């Protein structure tokens, strides 16, 4: 500010009206840097005298102002700096006088609303390069808290450079790391250097983290931070030899910093930083020597997942499957931050544990004497083995999309073990038992007695319905897939859902299964152009004729395709079902996927479930349907591993052995074998192919006989498609699901009477531990899931942490995935370890344990606690 402007401003202020009770005006002009000392003689005011403090005339000036002259206006020029208030003899006069500053630092401080004192002025001068731009000054003045001390000003400048509104050390440090570990290319750090904030940054790091290095190095700092944090959940002896990177006195701060970052929205850079530390400290090689139990509680290093999975998958490959260890480990690790990149591997070995548990329950094999009893066992429990196998291979296929060099081959070895459990033991043992006990009934009747039949579907389910009925037929949706969907429909919709089964017609192929589901008195076959065609009362049942067959029985019927419906506008598809009593909707996702690739089938099962649930919503919300049946034409048999020769039967018995000419052989094969697939053969009567079971074909009212391989054996054929098959008599192929879905309107009597039963709610988690007093910075608590996940109780995820009375978080966050299905309450418990932040805690204050639904749909639970820790420390007072 130039002298003329100073004189103008001072004249204006002295000319202003005096405050009440004031007889004159005294203004102190502070100029600690003595910028205007040489220009003071130029300052001549209209209505005030000018006097200057020299450092030696304080007494005479005070006498002048307080005794000698009580009426004249004075401008007191003060270039003095006092170390203590007592050194300032004019302090009492200053307190009732006005203040004026004309130096740049003072103007900046006034602009930013900073307290003016020597210490603050010193730091503003230190950051002169930063404050030289108005937009940068604005970043400091508009922070959530205006700095009041030099320490706070250091933080504020660093926070402003980082683009932060809160000057928190953790966020400043995180912002630096997010720009990379190379100081030369780290834009935030280079700005610290540019604006002289780098010294403050390293002072903050030294005080908070205990990191001291002669040469600044973010890589070394990262190693120090993560290793020190790890000692909070891992015994320090496991990191022996790395002691120079660990500061136990700063353990709490380092753990808090890493924990907060782990549970923030932006953890991508932390993953890279953690990987860097793992590499430099050779942590993978170190952790390999530890046990799973030693590692399972530490989450900051991604490689811990690789070590744990390597150990567990190696054991599985060596035929050591500890169900409890695998289950408990996955339970613990799935709440960790770095779980997602390894989720497919963990899910896979969890299914191995489920399969092993099933194996232990049935290790004696399957020796049921009656076919209907095996059928009952399969539909009540045995089918779960098919589900475990499907879920395992879903995880395995997904893992192939995101390669992990350490785990990929190991997972493939696990696949071999799974194939042994499922294909050789389960399908072999159960298939052998089933083939033995059903052979006579299939040969004599073509069906299992006392089991509902697919051929009776329309007669027993549709004709007897007194309301409009929608029938969804999903090609190749086997029973276990339908069971999964039924469970989801029950939990996700306001409905009454049940699942039952019926035996598919033989052979369990699309054209026969689809025909069996149509109205008919009799199914017959004819050979048209060398192709076996299925007729319902003389009418073709091919896809283009199904609408006609339905309308013949009931004119208010219609056959639709799922793909057509989905592509239509709402009004268009609603018009198609208007006035109809029976609506058949054909869905083909699973079987269609098998035509592309056998390995795509299990993923298609998941897709089919999603599509069918959506179709149910369309029927309910757009078509007004309340009565829906979901079924299939047949199931399927799938095994991943290549089949061995002993898993196949030759079809030489299908042909006339005396014919050698290839053309004649072809004609003879058509004559002797009307149709065959990998799992069935339809032969001319009298033909007895080797190694196949006879199955009475269409009640014996045709000129053909049916045959099927035992167990999961395939008939040799050219081409692919050996792994995904259907048409045979295995339980996986023949057990056809029937889901009965009844939507319950709010005004329905069933819903009103059983509202508690049908309303789906998330399961809740409560504190089990009785003690409400905390006496250590690290402690554990037990929790329990109140209800088991069931038809009307869905899984939920909870975040659990501690807060003070004002709601400020004072601990790390623990996650509880409440999805336990056991009816045994002791099996629905969780144990969480908490780490309190480095704060000062009062034993008279109330603190709260918060149990919060991750989706925020429920009111958080708050349990009061007392904290009594004798040596708890306060937050770091940085730069003190």
Segments the model singles out, each with a brief description of its role:
Residues 1-468, 478-628, 632-880:
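…; additionally, a secondary subgroup of soluble metalloenzymes is captured
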Residues 472:
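Beta1/beta-strand and adjacent pyrophosphate-binding region of the FAD-binding site
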